[in-house]
Swiss-Prot record:
The keyword rRNA-binding applies. Transmembrane segments: none annotated. GO terms for biological process: translation. This is Small ribosomal subunit protein bS6. GO terms for molecular function: small ribosomal subunit rRNA binding; structural constituent of ribosome. Belongs to the bacterial ribosomal protein bS6 family. NCBIfam families: S6 (TIGR00166). The gene is rpsF. InterPro entries: Ribosomal_bS6 (IPR000529), Ribosomal_bS6_sf (IPR035980), Ribosomal_S6_plastid/chlpt (IPR020814), Transl_elong_EF1B/ribsomal_bS6 (IPR014717). GO terms for cellular component: cytosolic small ribosomal subunit.
Amino acid sequence: MALYEHVFLARQDMSAQQVDALVEQYKGVIEANGGKVGRVENWGLKSLTYRINKNRKAHYALMDIDAPAAAVHEVERQMRINEDVLRYMTIAVEAHEEGPSAMMQKRDRDDRPRRDGDRPDRGDRGDRGDRGPREGGRESFGDRPRRPREDRA
């Protein structure tokens, strides 16, 4: 039997329980066709790069599959029919990765506390402190005088 990684996207208006039920449904299809499912990861609701069927977000799920090609074809056929599945992708792999996937590691990294203090959007200025106000106030354009506005009618 061949090894596969299978990722699918489910509609954004589904609940997490419905996505889990969808995973269990496809797990049953694989097992009924002589395969087995190893690791299953639910990556949660994430933003899409572009809209798919008027959806801006989707629930992502990953399954590690050890099954014959016929089982994978049957799962893909059922996913094409199901309107709750927006996209799917199956990739043949040499071996399944051990431990959490890169997406789950990224989620763990995002949960860690930040180290950059009270200004996370700017670089560290060291011991220099803030710059303070500019000379001349807001109206100043340096050594250049301000031109009068032309009325366009």
